[in-house]
């Protein structure tokens, strides 16, 4: 039997929103396999589909800037929200974005080695800022995009940099449309541009979970297939940008809105500060442990 730790129970709770003891039981039944435990809870109707990147824990800010040909979205982390609101920190983030936009390095490692206008490397520039600001600071990630003449970048920053989105539309130069799409992505967080981008493996996996879910609900086998077909279609529309109701006008889809301008979404990047990074929460672990031992 797998050793089910308090940390595992905590992680499953965060990913599914299910109760503590339900999570413990799911992990026991699946011998500690986190992904199978998520499916177990969903099949029992206890949890909804988990988004693997939902765990937001660190501080900092995102930033998006562009010029006529290129755009960059990046995330810089700090230890506290207080520092993230500090003018010096925000100036550092802006300087790093301008540096990456100008140099367009291939990797994070390359970016840290590039030379700033003042002669310092990016790494030394960050190290100096750490000394001044008094907190650990790191350039976590970035993406650079390039566009053609008949294209448009959309930039949107939400909650003072908590979320940063960069979109690229082809077939239109309407930056307002591109920004509207970026705003939608910030709010709804789609996984894909279109349902055609969803892998066969993901579709089949979701179909299996939905089938078991319907059977566990006691539905007759002869109607399960139609139920699964309808639920799968709904699932695909929920994770695909083009199929989603547009936040500024729910009567049309995002795909239809973009088509009105003659364009098409070809890529998007959505960064949320700290997604996938977990803070240490000893008190919560102790609380869980006390329940697990009962």
UniProtKB/Swiss-Prot annotation:
Cell location: Cytoplasm
UniProt keyword Cytoplasm, yes or no: yes
Region (Involved in Mg(2+) ion dislocation from EF-Tu): 80-83
GO terms assigned for molecular function: translation elongation factor activity
GO cellular component terms, A-Z: cytoplasm
Keywords tagged on the record: Cytoplasm, Elongation factor, Protein biosynthesis
Major site of localization recorded for this protein: cytoplasm
Superkingdom of source: Bacteria
Family matches, as Gene3D superfamilies: 1.10.286.20, DNA helicase RuvA subunit, C-terminal domain, Elongation factor Ts, dimerisation domain
Keyword check for Ribosomal protein: no
NCBIfam families on file: tsf
Family: Belongs to the EF-Ts family.
Stated role: Associates with the EF-Tu.GDP complex and induces the exchange of GDP to GTP. It remains bound to the aminoacyl-tRNA.EF-Tu.GTP complex up to the GTP hydrolysis stage on the ribosome.
Protein name, UniProt field: Elongation factor Ts
Native species: Listeria monocytogenes serotype 4a (strain HCC23)
Gene: tsf
